[in-house]
Structures are given as structure tokens and as C-alpha cells.
């Protein structure tokens, strides 16, 4: 069947169809989620400059041939999941292959890309029991990481035949036959040079020749359909600086570092500690860049020097309110998850830790995942969607779910969006949960993304407010020793508190009323979105109604345990 007309092919349109052959018109630029899901199609021909939604052809178990065009812009999450008759996938030029983009296909043996790849995510190959080789014949501009593949027991070869600009690939868990990647071209920057060897320059001008090729390739990509995928030279500049520094070309390294600083594409704390830049550390050019860089991104310095709050300035008389454990939805959550069994015995703090630990181990953190399509934004529906789709949630989703679990247990809780000063250009915010402990008479910091709480030097658990004040005042802080990301990467207080959270505690935003489904559409009656701002930053608009009154923003929960007033 040939489909006629329209730029967007709607979600689910031919899901479950009995069609044997499917050709999309060249005018189609987007195929939405599950468009051909679980159909009987055997052959699909795709149009140029294509963007796909997730699971476009998932569970098409009779599919044996996919005709890819000259240029595919994006091939996203689980697009071919469960297509068990496919043995070979052969792309031409492709802008983006997403996380688990090629996954759960029993017969797939070979993935080959003949042209240019703008970006591949980490773990783009996942659970492919017959996969033996992944071949990139052309240039690969950037990769995610750390895994090139996961749970592909027969995978023995990953080869990069062209230039690789920037790679964060470092392992292949569940792929025992693959020890490292093969390279035939220049690898400008590799985060793990044992797994993906990087270049060394001869020092006779070949650095300038390579740099001309890099500039040409990036400009060429930006003029074509992949521009939004690869980014500009400014986006790549910092890691190119690292690559040329390690290769011994100081002049080119400093040019790229200056470009990164000028466009705010690097962080002070990282630059001064990054051993990749050691070869240029003592140059005049490097030292001249540091003052500007510190004003941009020394996050402890910025937080320490920000204006104070103005306690008592909020006069509207409103209070923060919380769903009661006796509410029907909260009762259902408590029973559905068997929260009393998860929480166990001991103090309320002991129970809070166990509930967070259970959530952390049950739903993984996926920073690019967002909320599942079609799922209501409440703990039960989000949990069921994650289990069914074998997916995780981003920090907002996890903090939202944890807040509901806590309220179902009778503990007032909010999730709080923590944002940087440069929130309008830095989209890397973080969302955590605050929960009221009756035994301690205070709010506590709980972060399900990293299974983390924060203490003072005596082991006393702290609130978000206390952590922020201690960072500003230089007082000691600690995190629990088992804090981690997805039970893979251990967290340290230096990275988590003094870099990541110091950046993200400039603005703080939360809902006036906390309940299930509070983000499942427009704000509910009686709810507002409130942002706590340092004095003088009014009008920055990180979200919602603004206040400088930290006493009001962090008001005790005991006064408002009976729902909305």
C-alpha cells in the first residue's frame, strides 16, 4: 500500500493492520508513535528527512525489510522493538539513533550505517541476542554513553570506519565478546581511550588539516537536515578543546576553549579539574579565560554571592496544603503498592528512606524520558506504564511519584523544581522531594533519582532550605554513602552537592497544593505554582507566582494537615 498526502502520519493509524507492503510518500516528514504497531507488514519503504516517534513499527513480527532513504533525521525509542524477523538493518545518513532505538529483535545480526551519523545515544543497541556486528562506514559526529550496547551476548565487533568527533562510549555491559571498538579514522575526543582509542597528532601541521575537516563536516551537517541534532561548533567546542589538548596542539585547543567560554558551553569547576586540559593549563591564554568563566559557572561562588531572601514579605495569607492519607486516591495508592510492608518498622524517617529506596530500585531514572505517553500523572498509572513499557522516568516524574507515596502514608510532601540562575539557557534543572518528619519536626530532603538524603557533620538529616544555607555559608555537608544513579554510578558530595545542586538551588518552584495528578493538565482549583526568588531577581520568571519570603515558602506542614482550607 502507498499512503498519499500529509506531512505527519498519525499515531496508531495502521496499528494491527493486515497490510503486507507499505510505502510512505516523500512528503511525509514525521511518523508518529506506534503508527504501524503490531501490524502484519513485511516490507516498509520510508521517506527522506524522516523523524519517527517511539515504537513506530514495534512488534511487526513478520517484517523482513525496511527500506531506509538517503537521510533519516531521527530514529527514536524502540522504533523496531519486537520485529523478530529482521536480520539486517542498513541505514544511509542518519541524524539521531535514540536510546534503545534498536532493541528486542531476536534475529537481528548486523547493523550497518553507510553514511554520516550526527549522534547516537548510549545503549542504542539493546537486548539483541543474535547481533554480531555494528558497522559505521562514515563519520560519526557525537555519541552518548557510557554503553555502546547492552545485553547482546554474541556482539563481537563495533567498527568506526570514519572520523569520530566526540565519544562518551566506555563499555558494553552484557556483551562479553566485545572488549573495545575498532577505529579506522581519527577519533578527536574519546572519554575512554582504552575502549575507543583517540588520536595523537604528529605536530607537523596535521592538526590544522584535521581541524579544517571538522569545521567543514559540522558546517555541512548544520546546513542539512541534521542541524538540530548535531549542534554548532560552539556546542562541540569544549570537548574539541580537550581532544586537541590531549593530542598536543595547544593553539587549536585554546581557540576551542575560548569559543566554549564565550558561548557559556563549559563549567568553571570542570575546567579547572579536567586532566584533559593539563597540556594547556600553564599557558597565558588559559589563565586569561578563568575570571570570565568563574562569573559564569562557579556555582558555589554564584550561590554565595546571590541576594538574600526577604522573610515576612508574603502577605496573601495562603498556606501550602497536602492530600490526606484518608483521601480515596491516597488510600488506593497505599493499598496498591502495599506501602506499609515496604516502609517496615522504626521511625518515620526510617520508613521514608525505605519507601524512597524501593522506588529508586523499581523505576529507573531516565533524564530524557519524560512522562509516558497516554499515562495519567499519578503514582499508579506512571508505575504501570513504566512496568509495561520497560522504561524509566525523569527526575520530575520520580519526585512526583515519591511525593504521592509519602502523602499516602500520611506524611505531607511536595516535589520541588530546583533551577539554575541561567535557567533560560541552561535546561538542566533537577526535581527532588521534600517530606515532613513529625519525629524531627522539620522538612527533609529526599531525592529518588539518586536515592539520596543530605546531612550535617553530625549525621542529622537536613531540609532543602538548610542545605542551601549551608552551601552559601560554607558549612559541612554529607550525603548517604550508598547514594547512586540507577545502581550504577556512585554519587559523591562534591559532584552532587557542590557542583550539581549548588547550580540548581538558585530558584525553587513548587505547587501550593500537593495531590495526585496535580500535573495532569491545567492547575486545579486552589492550586498555584510558586517560585522562591532572591531579592532583586523578581521578573526573571522561572515559573509561576514569585515570592522572596523563604519563611512562608518553607512553612511547617503541621498547620495544614487537613487538606485545603
Residue ranges: model-predicted function:
Residues 1-8, 17-30, 39-51, 61-74, ...:
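Structural signature of tandem-repeat unit edges
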Residues 472-565:
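Low-complexity, Gly/Ser/Thr/Pro-rich intrinsically disordered linker/tail segments
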Residues 400-475:
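Hydrophobic/aromatic-rich core segments of domains that either
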Residues 306-393:
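Secondary-structure boundary elements
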Amino acid at each position: 500500500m502507498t499512503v498519499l498526502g500529509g506531512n505527519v502520519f498519525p499515531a496508531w493509524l495502521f496499528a494491527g493492520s493486515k497490510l503486507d507492503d507499505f510505502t510512505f510518500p516523500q512528503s511525509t516528514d514525521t511518523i508518529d508513535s506506534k503508527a504501524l504497531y503490531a501490524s502484519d507488514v513485511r516490507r516498509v519503504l520510508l521517506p527522506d528527512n524522516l523523524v519517527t516517534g517511539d515504537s513506530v513499527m514495534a512488534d511487526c513480527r513478520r517484517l523482513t525489510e525496511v527500506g531506509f532513504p538517503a537521510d533519516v533525521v531521527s530514529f527514536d525509542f524502540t522504533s523496531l522493538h519486537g520485529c523478530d524477523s529482521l536480520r539486517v538493518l542498513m541505514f544511509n545518513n542518519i541524524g539521531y539513533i535514540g536510546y534503545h532505538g534498536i532493541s528486542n529483535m531476536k534475529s537481528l545480526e548486523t547493523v550497518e550505517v553507510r553514511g554520516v551519523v550526527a549522534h547516537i545515544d548510549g545503549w542504542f543497541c539493546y537486548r539483541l541476542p543474535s547481533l554480531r556486528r555494528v558497522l559505521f562506514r562514515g563519520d560519526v559526529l557525537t555519541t552518548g554513553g557510557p554503553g555502546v550496547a547492552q545485553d547482546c551476548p554474541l556482539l563481537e565487533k563495533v567498527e568506526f570506519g570514519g572520523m569520530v568527533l566526540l565519544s562518551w562510549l566506555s563499555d558494553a555491559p552484557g556483551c562479553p565478546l566485545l572488549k573495545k571498538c575498532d577505529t579506522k579514522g581519527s577519533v578527536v575526543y574519546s572519554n575512554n581511550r582504552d575502549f575507543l582509542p583517540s588520536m595523537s597528532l604528529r605536530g607537523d601541521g596535521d592538526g590544522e588539516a584535521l581541524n579544517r575537516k571538522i569545521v567543514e563536516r559540522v558546517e555541512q551537517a548544520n546546513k542539512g537536515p541534521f542541524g538540530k541534532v548535531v549542534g554548532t561548533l560552539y556546542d562541540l567546542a569544549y570537548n574539541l578543546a580537550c581532544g586537541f589538548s590531549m593530542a598536543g596542539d595547544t593553539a587549536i585547543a585554546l581557540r576551542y576553549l575560548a569559543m566554549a567560554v564565550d558561548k557559556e558551553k563549559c563549567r568553571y569547576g570542570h575546567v579547572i579539574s579536567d586532566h584533559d586540559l593539563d597540556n594547556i593549563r600553564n599557558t597565558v591564554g588559559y589563565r586569561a579565560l578563568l575570571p570570565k568563566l568563574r562569573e559564569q559557572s562557579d556555582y558555589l561562588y554564584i550561590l554565595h554571592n546571590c541576594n538574600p531572601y526577604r522573610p515576612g514579605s508574603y502577605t496573601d495569607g495562603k498556606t501550602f496544603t497536602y492530600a490526606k492519607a484518608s483521601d480515596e486516591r491516597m488510600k488506593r495508592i497505599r493499598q496498591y503498592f502495599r506501602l506499609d510492608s515496604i516502609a517496615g518498622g522504626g521511625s518515620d524517617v526510617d520508613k521514608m528512606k525505605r519507601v524512597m529506596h524501593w522506588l529508586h530500585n523499581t523505576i529507573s531514572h531516565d533524564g530524557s524520558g519524560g512522562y509516558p505517553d497516554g499515562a495519567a500523572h499519578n503514582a499508579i498509572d506512571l508505575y504501570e506504564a513504566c512496568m509495561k513499557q520497560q522504561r524509566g522516568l525523569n527526575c520530575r516524574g520520580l519526585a512526583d511519584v515519591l511525593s504521592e507515596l509519602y502523602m499516602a502514608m500520611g506524611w505531607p510532601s511536595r516535589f520541588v523544581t530546583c533551577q539554575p540562575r541561567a535557567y533560560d539557557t541552561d535546561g538542566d534543572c533537577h526535581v527532588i522531594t521534600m517530606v515532613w518528619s513529625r519525629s524531627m519536626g522539620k522538612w527533609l530532603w529526599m531525592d529518588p533519582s539518586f536515592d539520596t538524603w543530605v546531612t550535617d557533620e553530625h549525621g542529622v538529616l537536613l531540609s532543602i532550605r538548610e542545605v542551601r544555607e549551608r552551601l552559601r555559608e560554607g558549612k559541612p555537608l554529607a550525603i548517604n554513602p550508598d547514594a547512586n544513579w540507577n545502581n550504577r554510578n556512585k554519587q559523591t558530595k562534591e559532584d552532587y552537592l557542590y557542583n550539581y545542586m549548588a547550580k540548581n538551588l538558585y530558584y525553587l518552584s513548587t505547587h501550593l497544593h500537593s495531590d495526585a495528578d496535580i500535573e495532569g493538565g491545567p492547575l486545579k482549583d486552589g492550586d498555584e505554582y510558586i517560585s522562591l526568588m532572591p531579592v532583586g531577581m523578581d521578573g526573571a520568571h522561572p515559573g509561576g507566582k514569585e515570592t522572596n519570603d523563604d519563611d512562608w515558602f518553607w512553612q511547617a506542614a503541621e498547620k495544614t494537615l487537613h487538606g485545603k482550607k
